[in-house]
Amino acid sequence: MDQGGTGAPAHTAATYGQYAGTWFAGHSPVYAAWAAHVAATASLAALIATLPPDKRQPNLVFAATQFLGCPDADPATWEAFLRGNWPAVRTVVLGHRTQTNEPRRCATLLPVFGLIAARTRRPLALIEVGPSAGLCLLPDLYSYEYDGVTRLGTGAPLLRCTTTGTPPIPAAMPRIGSRAGVDLNPLDGTDPEMVRWLEALVWPGQDGRLATLRAALATLASPGTERPRLVAGDLNERVAELVADVPPTHTAVVFHSAVLAYLPPGQRARFAATLATLDCHWVSNENFFLDDSGATVPSAHGDRFTLALDGRPLAHTGQHGATLDWIR
């Protein structure tokens, strides 16, 4: 059953140990404990290793158990739930993707969108790679508070962010002319089952994130909101099509957050090469730095992301948008 070879359980255990110590530590004690338990329990790592390689991620497996009703329990209780419901867990994992839709990341993206808008003086045509339900395509419909001061917007949710350095927080909301995205499996943020999955992807103990998600979903579902155009397909196959659809009166901005980590290095390099041929700006917010040649440089900042514009790093950001450390 080990689809990844004899080394798959050990690799799975190591991955869960890394998540426990780097990504979950200090953010979700429940997930940190579950991941550490998998790392320390060979039979549990072996069970998870029977999943296809791209379906073994802690976020996906844990979210599947949450989706099926597992409480935020101690590791032993979680393990019993996983084993007792393994066929159902496996079905959920195989039928879903890690499509966390984190609207708080708009607080770290907005200054870069503002920079582009100020330079081009045209409405932005936002094109998100891996948009999930498209909540990050609605930045102008939210409101923002940087360092305890409300600066922009009147909509919900209110996105709070602390900063260091001198980030170029815009004085006015950038004009958004159009919104589009490409995802292997776009989600309908108004469908109750898809909403349940999005909520299951929020880590235990992060009630603020859950409230923000629900407020953003309410904005998306509002009768006055024009829904983003979300197309199904491979990002490398369809991003050029979306850029080509942008009228000359708009500035195309292709952006992504926590998406390219799920691609093999060759596909990342292909994506960078494709963007280099397109008439667009490129905003990357990932846990590694992908330069304009497609080379991947791991982040040296633990659980931080590197925010870059057109292959040039500008800031380090909190993985869920709570912090912005400007380095330029």
Task: State what each model feature region is.
Residues 261-311:
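C-terminal substrate-binding/active-site "lid" region of AdoMet-derived donor-dependent transferases
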Residues 21, 35-123, 135-143:
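Class I SAM-dependent methyltransferase Rossmann-like catalytic core
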Residues 303-328:
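Structural signal for terminal/edge beta-strands and the immediately following C-terminal loop/tail
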Residues 1-50:
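Non-catalytic accessory regions outside enzyme or core folds
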Residues 250-265:
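A short SAM/SAH-binding and catalytic strip from SAM-dependent methyltransferases
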Residues 129, 231-233, 255-257, 285-286:
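Short His-Asn-centered micro-motif
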Residues 51-56, 70-73, 100, 115-232, ...:
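Class I S-adenosyl-L-methionine-dependent methyltransferase module
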Residues 238-247:
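Short amphipathic alpha-helix with an adjacent loop that forms part of the alpha/beta core around
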